[in-house]
Swiss-Prot record:
Highest classification ranks of the organism: Bacteria, Pseudomonadati, Pseudomonadota, Alphaproteobacteria, Caulobacterales
Name of this protein: Small ribosomal subunit protein uS14
Family statement: Belongs to the universal ribosomal protein uS14 family.
InterPro entries named in the record: Ribosomal_uS14, Ribosomal_uS14_bac/plastid, Ribosomal_uS14_CS
Signal peptide range: none
Assembly behavior: Part of the 30S ribosomal subunit. Contacts proteins S3 and S10.
Function: Binds 16S rRNA, required for the assembly of 30S particles and may also be responsible for determining the conformation of the 16S rRNA at the A site.
SUPFAM superfamilies: Glucocorticoid receptor-like (DNA-binding domain)
GO terms, molecular function: rRNA binding; structural constituent of ribosome
Pfam families per record: Ribosomal_S14 (PF00253)
Keywords assigned: Ribonucleoprotein, Ribosomal protein, RNA-binding, rRNA-binding
Gene designation per UniProt: rpsN
């Protein structure tokens, strides 16, 4: 089980990303629009830099829904390999069959 503080921190980051998503997207569009004057684009970059760092989507860490483990994460299942194997062995994941040869 992951530390609760790490899981909670990740939840706070997700909340911030959602809160600032529209503003960040608008500023990025202005900053990357080459038809605008250089000064205006630079202003947009400065405003973008003033936003909280944790409002960037790249700061979100994918974590297992079951244990909170940050590594070996399967995006499709939203869980780590350890949880997948454990739940699969107990037959709790539909369609997952243990291989044997």
């Amino acid at each position: 089980m992951a530390k609760k503080s790490a899981v909670n921190r990740n939840e706070r980051v997700k909340k911030l990303v959602k809160q600032y998503a529209a503003k960040r997207e608008a500023l990025k569009a202005i900053a990357n629009d080459e038809s605008l004057p250089l000064e205006e684009r630079f202003e947009a970059r400065l405003k973008l830099a003033e936003l909280p760092r944790n409002s960037a989507a790249v700061r979100i860490r994918n974590r297992c829904e079951v244990t909170g483990r940050p590594r070996a994460y399967y995006r499709k299942l939203k869980m780590s390999r350890v949880s997948l194997r454990e739940l699969g062995s107990h037959g709790l994941i539909p369609g997952l069959v243990k291989s044997s040869w």
